[in-house]
Amino acid sequence: MRLVIARCSVTYEGRLNAHLPTATRLLMVKADGSVLVHSDGGSYKPLNWMSPPATLHVEEPSPDQADQGVTQVWRVQAKKSDDRLIVLIEEVLADDSHELGVDPGLVKDGVEADLQRLLAEQISLLGDGHTLVRREYMTAIGPVDILARDADGGTVAVELKRRGDIDGVEQLTRYLELMNRDPLLAPVRGVFAAQQIKPQARTLAEDRGIRCVTLDYDAMRGVDDAESRLF
């Protein structure tokens, strides 16, 4: 993991074009090849990023760029598309690298882990014709609980929660934004699945085109014991 704090401007070129004017930002370079650009406020998600697989090249600035104060140019090129992230760095305030090793991954509580296993085994609960691709589909910003295909072969990303709230919807939204950049996956539809979904979360999800599914944990386990139900 490399962490660079720098004054820089950032341009994303590809299926979506976006530009961030010069400001002090955190540049995160991960071992999987992803590069993420963060600010110190506004949101906990990156302002822009390049998902793996990608290649980072550091270059000297052109004479015109140097005249404008640029000291180095980062070009992050996606390997599966023409998308690229261009970072023009004017000043590096900090540059640290750390070896983090292999991460064991997110450990869910017992019910959420069981819900994931059960839904993977009973994927038809999402609708007729759905098939499981895999559990814990890894992205540059974290694992999607379940990746599936619908009856038409479309990609479906499922976020599972014991109790579904707005944070869960925001999390799934970030995954969808990232995954829909991948031509091998897009278009990707989202499903927010939980034992109980708060009204505000349902409203936000539906506004963003995310389908909500309420799961009956006892029925999925083949249990119908009123005394042991959580809700």
UniProtKB/Swiss-Prot annotation:
Q: What is this protein called?
A: Endonuclease NucS
**Do you know which NCBIfam families this protein is assigned to?**
PRK03298.1
Q: Which GO terms describe its molecular function?
A: DNA binding; single-stranded DNA endodeoxyribonuclease activity
Q: Entry's CDD domains?
A: NucS-like
* Domain of life, source organism: Bacteria
Cite a GO CC annotation: cytoplasm
Cell location = Cytoplasm
Q: Which family does it belong to?
A: Belongs to the NucS endonuclease family.
- UniProt lists the gene as nucS
Kindly state which keywords UniProt assigns to this record, in alphabetical order: Cytoplasm, DNA-binding, Endonuclease, Hydrolase, Nuclease
| Top-level EC class as recorded in UniProt | hydrolase
Record function comment: Cleaves both 3' and 5' ssDNA extremities of branched DNA structures.
Q: What is the lineage of its organism?
A: Bacteria, Bacillati, Actinomycetota, Actinomycetes, Micrococcales
Enzyme Commission designation: 3.1.-.-
